Design a protein with these regions (language model features):
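Glycine/small-residue-rich hydrophobic helix-like segments
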Residues: 185-229
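Non-catalytic, topology-defining segments of multipass membrane proteins
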Residues: 1-182, 208, 218-247
């Protein structure tokens, strides 16, 4: 089965799992679980997606310990964006070819559908974009068994209770999928990379996208006083806990 087909099935599953969980909680007066799930989903998206797979694994914008690194790697994997080497490699390629015909999700050269579901593609990338990832045993393992691991995790959660896949992973998956596809890859690149307060609020700092493209080696997109970057603040908090101080 093709990579894109597997990813479509995975995302389709997360849609169904989330819808079922919300319906079950609604008819059984368990909406408090949904509220807790939303809080978990926010942390899940920030730590695994924006701080982890994006700013740490893709851009190496900060250093952390092995435990935090492992947590970020696996939380990011559970979101269902795709295999780590593929996703990270595509994003590095995007930065190298931003807003050109080679950019895999440029709104100038791609349709809405191609941008939203751009991660269905598994292009062959030059080793210069992924060589460091291929040296990492944990990432190689996750790359090789990605879909089997997610199937196992979701089946286990289903056996415990049918609402768990949707509450624990579905909400976070759908949020990062649509926020990345619609806001960051599309709206934040209309007319080139741009900054937008609303997008930044909705994506916990990722919406200061022009700042990010100016210098992706920095873990925070906060340049002007009002450009609050929640993800950057959380990274800073982690770094302070580990090192005692951080610039």
């Amino acid at each position: 089965m093709l990579y894109g087909t597997k990813l479509r099935l995975l995302w389709g599953w997360y849609h169904l799992a989330t819808a079922y969980s919300l319906y079950y909680c609604y008819i059984n007066d368990l909406m408090s679980l949904v509220y807790y799930s939303l809080i978990w989903g926010v942390l899940f998206v920030i730590v695994g997606g924006y701080a982890g797979w994006h700013r740490y694994f893709t851009h190496k914008s900060f250093k952390t310990d092995k435990i935090t690194r492992t947590i970020m790697l696996w939380l990011g994997a559970a979101m269902g964006l795709g295999k780590p080497v593929t996703v990270v490699g595509i994003h590095r390629y995007h930065h190298a070819n931003s807003d050109t015909e080679q950019d895999i999700h440029s709104p100038k050269y791609s349709t809405w559908w191609e941008i939203l579901f751009g991660y269905y593609k598994e292009p062959k990338l030059s080793k210069k974009y992924i060589s460091d990832l291929l040296k990492d045993k944990q990432i190689r393992f996750l790359q090789k068994y990605y879909f089997k691991i997610l199937i196992l995790i979701n089946l286990t959660l289903l056996l415990i209770h049918p609402i768990l896949p949707g509450l624990l992973f579905g909400i976070g998956n759908l949020y990062v999928m649509y926020s990345t596809g619609i806001i960051i890859n599309n709206l934040n690149h209309r007319g080139g990379s741009n900054n937008n307060l609303l997008y930044a609020i909705l994506t916990f700092g990722e919406g200061w996208h022009d700042n990010h493209h100016l210098d992706s080696s920095k873990y925070s997109n906060w340049i002007k006083w009002y450009q609050i970057d929640i993800t950057g603040l959380i990274i800073k908090w982690f770094l302070k806990r580990e090192h005692g101080s951080v610039s």
